[in-house]
């Protein structure tokens, strides 16, 4: 692979993917290509070192090609899920989704990092603001033993909501918040940490 990382960004029909792309363009020794979820063909995937599953509307079951990609690639190539991608990874491993009491769209929350050793959220100081755009969340109590919670938010009007997790043994990470949002203070650092993790895996 060398030092340059090549990522596939799966576009789940969401305009935020363009913000993800802009952050990726700012990172050194990294190339990428964007594939619309509806055009995914497992038999003809381009060569890649890792995957980013973008945000998107609705729930993971509305994106069957992304779900098939997760089944094929989880544990094989490093994966980062963002928002919808985070929820899809959680469901793949057996966790459940819950609906929030009220949607969070363009909402700023303070991140509480609980796994300082995690190579991705460890790049974000506790208390940093993150941008949230979701009405569903992963039920932290339903996480199987293979998934480790790494960060959460705890706004006064909603209690603790899982914001990040990783797989205990596989190169899988995900976040409910949007690192590419202008609200998120350390989004570039988070994506850079994922690129570093991809290099380390290979």
In which residue ranges do the predicted regions lie?
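Generic structural signal for residues in well-ordered beta-strands
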Residues: 32-34, 97, 149
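A glycine-centered loop/beta-turn motif at secondary-structure junctions
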Residues: 158-202
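Cysteine-nucleophile active-site neighborhood
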Residues: 48-123, 129, 191
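Histidine-centered divalent metal-coordination motifs
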Residues: 83, 134, 178
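Short loop/helix-cap segments at secondary-structure boundaries that form the rim of catalytic
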Residues: 25-26, 42-47, 89-92, 140-144
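N-terminal beta1-alpha1 cap of cysteine-dependent amidohydrolase-like domains
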Residues: 1-67, 71-75, 84, 185-186, ...
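Short loop/edge segments at beta-strand edges and connector loops
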Residues: 36, 99, 132
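Catalytic beta-strand/loop cores that center a nucleophilic Ser/Cys/Thr
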Residues: 118-169
């Amino acid at each position: 692979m060398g030092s340059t990382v090549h990522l596939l960004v799966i576009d789940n029909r969401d305009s935020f993917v363009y913000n993800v792309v802009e952050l990726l363009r700012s990172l050194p020794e990294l190339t990428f290509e964007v594939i619309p979820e509806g055009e995914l063909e497992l038999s003809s995937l381009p060569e890649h070192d890792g995957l980013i599953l973008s945000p998107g509307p609705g729930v993971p079951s509305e994106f069957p090609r992304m779900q098939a990609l997760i089944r094929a690639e989880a544990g094989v190539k490093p994966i980062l899920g963002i928002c919808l991608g985070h929820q899809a990874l959680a469901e793949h491993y057996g966790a459940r989704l819950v609906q929030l009491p009220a949607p969070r769209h363009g909402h700023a929350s303070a991140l509480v990092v609980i796994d300082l050793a995690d190579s991705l959220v460890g790049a974000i100081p506790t208390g940093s603001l993150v941008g949230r755009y979701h009405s569903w969340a992963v039920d932290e109590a339903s996480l199987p033993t293979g998934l480790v919670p790494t960060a959460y938010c705890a706004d006064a009007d909603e209690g603790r909501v899982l914001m990040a997790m990783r797989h205990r043994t596989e190169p899988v990470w995900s976040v409910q918040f949007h690192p590419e949002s202008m609200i998120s203070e350390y989004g570039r650092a988070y994506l850079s940490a994922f690129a570093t993790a991809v290099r380390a895996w290979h």
